Amino acid sequence: MVKGTNAEQALAREEASSSRPKRQRVPSIVEEEGENGGGDVVVRSGTLFELDLLDCPICCNALTIPIFQCDKGHIACSSCCTNVSNKCPYCSLAIGNYRSRIMERVVEAFIVRCPIVAGEASSSRQKRLRVPSIDEENGENGGRDVVVPSGTLSQLDLLDCPVCSKALKISIFQQSLFLAKRQNGCTETFSYGNELVHEKKCSFALCYCPAPNCNYAGVYKDLYSHYAANHKKLWTRFSCGYSMHVCMDFESKSLVLQQYSDGPLVVLQCFKEPPQGLFWTVNCIAPSAPGVGKFSYELSYSTAGNTLTFRSSEMNRIQKVSFQTPEKDFMFIPEYILCPMGLYKGTYICIRSLEEEEEEEEDNED
């Protein structure tokens, strides 16, 4: 049987060692039932007596992942980011784009007990603790029972500086770091926690091959070369500014167009959803980096005297093809006007380069 309470054992260990890591007795299931068991492991933990610090400062509910922060460090839960229209109520900066990774790790590492104390219900996440007085610490009976919201941080090293490994003290600053370099890769720096935001706009972000059963992924230029070299039978060439007939039936579901050898890849997809009709999407496989894969397009479908036209001033850029029915940026063809023979007739697309159009406008202004 374990002698003394856990608190008494912890106090004895603290007196025996001045180093920050504490060696605690971790009981096994057998030991808790009365038999000797368990082993000695080094566990660093601490108690937080203000557990409401882990509540969302806007809605006051317990923080859950994902947790977001603005550029000034104010945090909010995902629901509140939506409710405040992604505008921080404290500083009016944008919030909802950048994850607060350290807060997410801290919240995950906290352990709280059931709020039921001695058979009586207490308020949420509150428990009764013995707070010793000075006399009690000197050996005399004292102290008092108070109800405080508290929890145990099971990974105390989360509160250490990741550089020097010493305990963090105010002021604490965000760390700037390099994106993991690939060969001849990106050297841009950004705040810690903003990796995903940067990667979407980074020209070195990975793009995935649209060919069926192909697992290739690489930077967009390498992907274009890979597709031209390995999947020639699967693509059709397009030229900017020229309307072309789209030869694809309902069962194909996707068609890949390539501007020229090693050129940009454009994916046309159709999603048939009976009895509604057909959803058409057009996307360029490219990162959202400036000057990469910027196109506009016009898609049209004609049958039995009916013509539908969809124009987009800027084609969506994606890194990986999705096979989910789109919720926006699509052309919808009702079931009743679909050609029973499929889409071999009457479907045309015209793709234009936005960069070329911008250059022409500049030349005309000159």
Swiss-Prot record:
Catalytic activity, reaction form: S-ubiquitinyl-[E2 ubiquitin-conjugating enzyme]-L-cysteine + [acceptor protein]-L-lysine = [E2 ubiquitin-conjugating enzyme]-L-cysteine + N(6)-ubiquitinyl-[acceptor protein]-L-lysine
What keywords sit in the KW lines?
Metal-binding, Transferase, Ubl conjugation pathway, Zinc, Zinc-finger
- PROSITE patterns membership: ZF_SIAH (PS51081)
User: If you read the UniProt record, what top EC class would you report for this enzyme, in one word?
Assistant: transferase
Q: Where are the zinc fingers (SIAH-type)?
A: 109-232
Give the residue ranges for region: SBD: 106-354
Q: Does the keyword Zinc apply?
A: yes
Pathway, per Swiss-Prot/TrEMBL?
Protein modification; protein ubiquitination
Which positions in this protein are listed as binding Zn(2+) 2? 209, 214, 226, 231
Q: Which GO terms describe its molecular function?
A: transferase activity; zinc ion binding
The segments labelled Disordered in the record are 1-37
Q: Where are the zinc fingers (RING-type)?
A: 56-92
Report the EC number(s), separated by commas if there are several. Answer: 2.3.2.27
Biological process according to GO: protein ubiquitination
Q: Does the keyword Disulfide bond apply?
A: no
Q: Which domain of life is it from?
A: Eukaryota
Q: Which Pfam families match?
A: Sina_RING, Sina_ZnF
What InterPro entries does the annotation carry?
A: Sina-like_RING (IPR049548), SINL_plant (IPR044286), Znf_RING/FYVE/PHD (IPR013083), Znf_SIAH (IPR013010)
At which positions is Zn(2+) 1 bound? 114, 186, 198, 202
Q: What family classification does the UniProt entry report for this protein?
A: Belongs to the SINA (Seven in absentia) family.
What job does this protein perform? E3 ubiquitin-protein ligase that mediates ubiquitination and subsequent proteasomal degradation of target proteins. E3 ubiquitin ligases accept ubiquitin from an E2 ubiquitin-conjugating enzyme in the form of a thioester and then directly transfers the ubiquitin to targeted substrates. It probably triggers the ubiquitin-mediated degradation of different substrates.
Q: What does its UniProt record remark on the domains?
A: The RING-type zinc finger domain is essential for ubiquitin ligase activity.
Q: What is this protein called?
A: E3 ubiquitin-protein ligase SINA-like 1
Q: Which organism is it from?
A: Arabidopsis thaliana
Q: What is the lineage of its organism?
A: Eukaryota, Viridiplantae, Streptophyta, Embryophyta, Tracheophyta
